[in-house]
Structure formats: C-alpha cells, structure tokens
From Swiss-Prot:
Monomer. Its main location: cytoplasm. GO terms for cellular component: cytoplasm. The keyword Aminoacyl-tRNA synthetase applies. It is found in: Cytoplasm. This is Arginine--tRNA ligase. Its EC number is 6.1.1.19. One of its GO terms (biological process) is arginyl-tRNA aminoacylation. Keywords: Aminoacyl-tRNA synthetase, ATP-binding, Cytoplasm, Ligase, Nucleotide-binding, Protein biosynthesis. Belongs to the class-I aminoacyl-tRNA synthetase family. It catalyses: tRNA(Arg) + L-arginine + ATP = L-arginyl-tRNA(Arg) + AMP + diphosphate. A motif ('HIGH' region) lies at residues 120-130. The gene is argS. GO terms for molecular function: arginine-tRNA ligase activity; ATP binding.
Length: 563
C-alpha cells in the first residue's frame, strides 16, 4: 500500500484538489510523535472560506480513517498515523517480491532523456575534478532509466579547437615517443606546457599553431592523422578509468562531431536577424535578459563553445526528440548555458526550456599527500588506485583472512570515492580527506557497505527459513521506523529526478543504514525469543539488504557481500 497516495486519495474525497497536487503538498512531520504524514490546509482556505485550522478540524471528522491508527489536527495541519502492522507487511512483501526492481516505475516510459556528462578534454589529464560530472551524470542516467526513461548518455569530448594546433607544433618539435607510449597523457601535457613556455619567447609559434588548426579544419591528411592519434591515445587512458568505474556511454560525439554543423547554425541565427557585429566578432545581444552577448564567432571568424553547444542541442533534438537534455557541467558554466538556452529560444526553439544545466562544485584536498604526476594535477586513475590500496591496508588490519580481499578492496575503495562525490548537494565543494572517506563510521560509503555486509552475514547464518512470516511480530519502534524508511525508496528517487540531485538517494540510503544498525543493536535477530519473531526479523533484514543494494546500484556503486 502506498500510504502517501492513500492520504492523498482520502483528502481528495473531501476537497476539490487533485491527487498529484495533494501528494506534492504532503509533508513528513518534524517529530515522529506528530505522525507519519501531514497535510497543510492553507491551500483550502479560499475554497472553504475558513481559517486553515478550522478546515483541518472539519476534515478530521469527515475523513475515512480505515488503514490509519488515527488522524489528528496540529493547528492548520491534518496529521495521519499509519497502521503500523499493515505498513510493515505491505512494504516488506513489496520489497521481497519485486527484489531488484523495487523502487522502479514506468513513469518515464516513452520519454527520451539526453544526459551529457564526463566530457574530458583530449590530450589533457582526466583529473579528480572530472569525477564530479562523471559520477553525477552516471547516477542520473541510472536513476532516470530505473524509472522508465530511455536515456542517451553522451560523452561530449573536448576534441576540437586551437589547442590542437598548438599540440601538433609541440609534437613535431619535442615529443619523446618512448614516454608517449608509457604515459600518453603525461607526455602530451608536458609538450603542451612546453609550447606555452616557448611561445612567450617566440610569438611565431602561435601563428604556426593557428595554421596547423586551419589545416586540421580543412581536412589535411598529416594534421588529421596526428589529431586521431592524440584522440586514440587519450581514449585508451580515459577508458581505464571508465572501466574502473563501470561506466559506458551511448555516444562519444564530441566537439569535432559538430564542426560541419556550425555554419548552418550561424546562418539560421543570421536569417532570424539575431546576429550582430561587435568589434569584428559576431554575437547575439541578450541585454534585455540581463546577460552579456552570446558570442557566436570570434573576430578571426573562428567558432567557439557556444556555437558548438547550439549545434549540439539542435542535432540532439532532431536525432533523439528528447523530453529533457541534461548538461552535467560545473557551476562556473551557468552563465554560458543561460546564454545558449536563451539564444535557442530567440531562434524559435521553444524546446530550449527542456534543456537543463546541472551544476556542481569544486574538489579540494584536505592536505597535499596525494601524489601528482605533473604539477598540482591529481589524476583520477591515481586517486582511485590509492583509495583501493588504502582500503586493502584497512582490510588487512581488520580482517586479514577475508576471502577475495583484493576484489573487496577494489569495490569498497572505488565505491567510497564515488559515494563521497554524491553524498551532499552537488553544488557544494568537496574536501577530500582519506580518513573520513574510508571510515567505517559516519556518513560514508564503507559505513553503508558494512551495513549491507552485516545484513548478508545474518542471512547466511539464518539459512533457509520456512513458513509464512507474521509481520505483526515486528512491533518495536526500531522495526517500524526501518520498514517505513524502506517504503520511502521511490519517494527518494522521484525527489532526485525532480531536483536532478543524486544526493537525495545517497542521503536516503545513509538513513536506511542508520535505522538498520539501530534495529540490529536493539534486537536479537538469530537469537530472537521465538521462531515467528526470528522469521519476521530475518525478512526485515533481507528487505533492507535489497533496498541498500538497489540504491547503491543507482549511484554506480557495487556492493560487497562480505567484509
């Protein structure tokens, strides 16, 4: 039984409000003793022409209370106390019958959602900042897919621009082929940095680089072969990280893919009378929207990011007919996307309202103990490997005889890092601290994983239990609170979709783990007072493990069965 929906249906029977609106208005009371659901009656004041607290009293008398222990008023709120036995039975039976599908729905059926995420720059380090977009995008992809949406994950590679002209010049002069084979990104970064150092002394290098890129744009064989080599070497390195994270994309159409589509976009903007000359550059004026102009072409005739993003959005709409197009890109790019979406609207593309920028914060290091290959850039692959190594050390201290400990360390170590990136509001900065990230206490990935492994250990020890569970035996506060939380999984997912915020699922599963450990510490499970209580509690453990596993899967994190 969906109690939130039941509350909404009962209110609808006595008001003119629609169920969808009522469900949005329903709140969870701040204190458990105030009930399980609360409906604020302010919305009804105009219709009923009474004060909200009087409306609450009137509804309390009229409402059908079947399925609820009681319905009470608290000022202008109508508070519902659910029938605990019915709720526990309904939730656990639903979880245990639906298993890995529990929490899913078909709400997005028939709707395409484009998710652009990760998008590293070719020939540049795949650094720790990139995990923010990669983890958020992957989680949103999985969450939306779980609710029936058809998702298209796009890795919009930074594989075009004048920097490739510079890299070609640098390659021809200074590349060490042996170093390139050993550490492609490191060597490409080294020669790119050297180009900038040398260009300060010799400005002719910049001219040469521009000519190289012009040749690349014109399809010159030599420049194109070098560009393809840079791209192949980079993707080989990037794929090591994607394999560690278990991430695959539906499309790798990056900036270069749109290079032959931009002239048509510029022409369309011009045809609409939007293109204005500004000191030799071509721009779209956005003064009336309190934004600076959106630059379409630089004074030298080169296109920039905005032009490519306009071309990409138009191509994606034509190709995928998306319901939503989500851009998981850092918060500093917020103005850029506002300019792009506004320009699309001015071009007559009303679907621009379906384009959403999902911003995120910065990654900071609590100390400088993370080794770096080049300067201050921390490579993501190194970070993940270090997390696995640190986790293996902890396992060797705590449980040296654990089977498959290397595999467990890999899942736990990588999962702990991903969990950290998804734990809080995405626009908050992350301060990276190994001690906190890998702790088995507190709001961490290992804490949630340990809760799951603890539950699985109980289930292995319990073995096959026969008979039908009597859920009325689960009468304690801890058992009810845990079951009630399990029943809220889909709500957490829908909140994550509504806010495009995976942390709604992460925070939810932390609360589930806390509630499970409270229950575990308060009650005997395998040594319960009788077999009926034991069976019911084992079923509660089984349902909890299923929900934790489902939630972590949505976040792109593997569970460990034992630790």
């Amino acid at each position: 039984m969906d109690y939130k929906n039941l509350v909404a249906e009962r209110i609808k029977e006595n008001t003119e409000l629609e169920v969808d609106l009522i469900e949005k208005l329903i709140e969870i009371p701040p204190k458990k003793e105030m009930g399980d659901y609360a409906f604020p009656c302010f919305q009804l004041a105009k219709t009923f022409r009474k004060a909200p607290n009087l409306i609450a009293e009137e509804l309390k008398e009229k409402i059908n209370k079947e399925g609820f222990e009681k319905v009470v008023t608290v000022g202008p709120y109508l508070n519902f106390f659910v029938d605990k036995t019915i709720l526990i039975k309904d939730v656990l039976e639903k979880v245990l019958s639906e298993k890995e599908k529990y929490g899913s729905s078909k709400v997005g059926e028939g709707k395409n959602v484009v998710v652009e995420y990760s998008s590293p720059n070719i020939a540049k380090p795949f650094h720790i900042g990139h995990l923010f977009t990669t983890a958020i995008g992957n989680a949103l992809y999985k969450i939306l897919s779980f609710e029936g949406y058809n998702c298209i994950g796009i890795n919009h590679l930074g594989d075009w621009g004048t920097q490739f002209g510079k890299l070609i010049s640098a390659y021809r002069r200074w590349v060490d082929e042996e170093a390139l084979e050993k550490d492609a990104i490191g060597e490409l970064l080294r020669i790119y940095v050297k180009f900038h150092e040398e260009a300060e002394k010799d400005p002719e290098l910049e001219k040469e680089a521009r000519l190289n890129f012009k040749n690349l744009e014109d399809g010159s064989k030599e420049e194109t072969e070098l560009w393809n080599r840079f791209k192949d070497l980079s993707l080989k390195e990037f794929n090591k990280v994607y394999d560690m994270l278990g991430i695959k994309f539906d499309s790798l159409a990056g900036e270069s893919f749109y290079s032959d589509k931009m002239d048509a976009v510029v022409q369309e903007i011009d045809d609409k009378g939007l293109l204005v000359d500004s000191n030799g550059a071509k721009v779209v004026m956005l003064d009336e929207y309190n934004m600076p102009p959106c630059m379409i072409k630089k004074s030298d005739g080169a296109t920039i990011y905005a032009t490519r993003d306009l071309a990409a959005a138009i191509y994606r709409k034509k190709t995928y007919d998306f319901h939503k197009c989500i851009y998981v890109v850092g918060t500093p790019q917020a103005l850029h996307f506002k300019q792009v979406f506004t320009t699309l609207k001015l071009m007559g593309h009303d679907w621009a309202d379906d384009c959403k920028h999902v911003g995120f914060g910065l990654v900071k290091l609590a100390n400088k103990k993370l080794s770096t290959r080049n300067g201050d850039v921390v490579f993501l692959e190194d970070l993940l490997n270090q997390s696995v190594e640190e986790t293996l050390k902890i396992i060797n201290e705590k449980n040296p005889n654990l089977k498959n400990k290397e595999d467990v360390a890999k899942k736990l170590g990588i999962g702990a890092v991903v969990f950290t990136y998804l734990k809080n509001n995405r626009e908050r900065d992350i301060v990276f601290d190994w001690k906190e990230i890998l702790s088995f206490d507190g709001e961490t990935g290992p804490y949630v994983e340990y809760s799951y492994a603890r539950g699985k250990s109980i289930l292995r020890k319990a073995g096959e239990l026969t008979g039908e569970a009597d859920y009325s035996k689960l009468s304690s506060k801890e058992e009810f609170e845990l079951a009630k939380l399990l029943g809220g999984f889909n709500d957490a997912i829908m909140n994550a979709i509504d806010k495009l915020e995976p942390a709604m699922v992460t925070r939810y599963i932390i609360e589930v783990a806390k509630a499970f450990n409270k229950f575990y510490n308060a009650h005997g499970i395998l040594n319960a007072e009788d077999n009926d209580v034991k069976l019911a509690r084992v079923k509660l453990v089984e349902a909890t493990c299923q929900v934790i596993k489902n939630a972590l899967n949505l976040l792109g994190i593997d569970v460990v069965e034992e630790m």
